[in-house]
UniProtKB/Swiss-Prot annotation:
Active site, renumbered: 134 (proton donor/acceptor), 295 (proton acceptor)
Assembly notes: Homodimer.
Residues binding IMP: 30-33, 60-63, 122-123
Annotated source species: Dictyostelium discoideum
PROSITE patterns: MGS
Protein name: Bifunctional purine biosynthesis protein purH
PANTHER family (UniProt xref): BIFUNCTIONAL PURINE BIOSYNTHESIS PROTEIN ATIC (PTHR11692:SF0), BIFUNCTIONAL PURINE BIOSYNTHESIS PROTEIN PURH (PTHR11692)
Amino acid sequence: MQALLSVYNKSGIVEFSKILSSKGFNLISTGGTAKSLVDNGLKVQQVSDVTEYPEMLDGRVKTLHPKIHGGLLARPELAHHQADLNKYNIKPISIVVVNLYPFVETVSKESTTLEEAIENIDIGGHTLIRASSKNFQNVLIIVDPSDYKWIGERIQSSTDSTNVLSSITLEERKKLALKAFQHGCSYDAAVSQYLSKVELTNATTIQGVKGTDSASVNVEFPQTFLPLYEKKNDLRYGENPHQKAALYQCPGTGGIANAQLLHGPALSYNNILDGDAALKAVREFDRCACVVIKHTNPCGLSVGVNDSEQAEVYKRAFNGDPKSAYGGILGFNRTLTLETATALKSVFYEVIIAPDYTEDALALLSKKEKLRILRIPEAANQIQFTQPDIRTITGGALLQSPNPIIRGDLAEATKNWKVVTENKPTEQQMKDLLFAWRVSKHVKSNAIVLSKDETIVAIGAGQPNRSQSVDICMKVGGDKVKGSVLASDAFFPFADSIDLAHQGNIACIVQPGGSIRDQEVIDAANKYGIPMVFTGNRNFLH
């Protein structure tokens, strides 16, 4: 009986190999794996001794040989297969233990060159996986070190000296083969994504459109898109209790999928969706910000002049809609302080997200048993996530480049805006318009955002027509609406929303423009003396 072992991740390989050796397996290995086994007192046959060819081309060719792959692919029940093995002096290989070069870890480093990435594309190991998995009825393929323990126990307890593998059922071998194929598939997907450069936006690209939210990114979508996600854990249930769900993460990235849970119960499906919305919203701002999220929509958001205002920023965000804040998700883009923790502790929240927490703030918040406290360091960075937006649809998927973050100071960020009315906004109104426009990107369309002093006053989200969203804002905002500014994520098709804005004493309006009735809308704004600005860009969010 023969076992071939060639692993990059050597965790547990020595202990597992000792079990195989004790059961009479001839251990075949190569390179660093062979050295590790020999150093631990195991007898190993080098692959080069089996193939009668040395490793060559800087190790690129090791196991690619008929004496290896013939031993993996032969079917013992076929007489002509056995005849070929005998003719060419090839011995069957019953167990293959392989895991691949760390391609994802390598290319996740910014300093990695193309040449370094290419050298980390595994050829021999990948081929071993495919050959062994194809013949899973006769070959046991192991790619996951976590499987060593149970397989080792089965082999060790086997009483059939002529067929040790009979202790592993055919169904179990099939599952191991499936895991191996998935391991190889995810590896190929990582290589494909790297080589095709399907990072639709990156820091350099976004800086290239600084001061605008025009997604003028030169993107050529690939003919075949292979998303790479690895299962992190099962979730209690999905969006509703009768739905099953699991969380998958994209290796080498941050975000909500890789958040560190410091305290509280496991995240639910809905917690993760809301947490992701909170993270995206606070990363929109380069100053101290706090957002309150409910069902992926902001119901409160505010920014401060400096970081020392964090507690006050939270209070302003909360007061945007105190009723909706209950049971919501909080997001911060600065380390959460004790003062802020004290201010929010009396309100029930499901989740808090921050780049970090002071020791005393974490201790205080941890007294709330059901509160989930997440650390996401990149929440403090105003850097665009590089993953494309992916939406599954029946029979396919949609990909798009992300709606980029708006960067720069007031002048830079609004340099392409156009005042279209007789009256012009004041500088403070322009600050509030920019704030509201940034927020509108994170509100479900049709979206209307009212703000004052860079704080949300009211939000109208997800309505089938725009005037309904405006009307909701007026009712939710109440007396606070007077003197606030209004942002609309898309153009006004009719002047009725301007009439409603006037009734609510709205001070100023920002919208993309582009309607065939733009002039009617402008005329209505001029009629009421309301300054209005066109951005030239739309912020739909479906």
